[in-house]
Amino acid sequence: MPQLEPAPWFSMLTVSWLIILLLIMPTIMFYQTQNTVSAQQATKPKQPTWTWPWH
């Protein structure tokens, strides 16, 4: 079975993962979210939640 011979596909697998981890991942991690969440912005809802009657 050709899948069991790692020579043709294992090198492509490792090269593609190295490209993803070393080049693309730092670029993606560089972006920051525009909306920062802080505890001061969090407010409780003004109306209580409606409880469903379970019969």
UniProtKB/Swiss-Prot annotation:
Q: Which keywords fit this entry according to its UniProt record? A: ATP synthesis, CF(0), Hydrogen ion transport, Ion transport, Membrane, Mitochondrion, Transmembrane, Transmembrane helix, Transport
Any Gene Ontology biological process: proton motive force-driven ATP synthesis
InterPro entries tied to this protein: ATP8_metazoa, ATPase_protein_8
* Descriptive protein name: ATP synthase protein 8
Q: What residue range is the signal peptide? A: none
Annotated transmembrane regions: 10-30
Gene name of the record = MT-ATP8
Source organism superkingdom = Eukaryota
Can you state the subunit structure given in the record? F-type ATPases have 2 components, CF(1) - the catalytic core - and CF(0) - the membrane proton channel.
Its membrane topology: Single-pass membrane protein
Asked if the keyword Transmembrane belongs to this entry, the reply reads: yes
Q: What does this protein do?
A: Mitochondrial membrane ATP synthase (F(1)F(0) ATP synthase or Complex V) produces ATP from ADP in the presence of a proton gradient across the membrane which is generated by electron transport complexes of the respiratory chain. F-type ATPases consist of two structural domains, F(1) - containing the extramembraneous catalytic core and F(0) - containing the membrane proton channel, linked together by a central stalk and a peripheral stalk. During catalysis, ATP synthesis in the catalytic domain of F(1) is coupled via a rotary mechanism of the central stalk subunits to proton translocation.
**What's the source species for this entry?**
Lampetra fluviatilis (European river lamprey)
Q: Tell me the protein family, please.
A: Belongs to the ATPase protein 8 family.
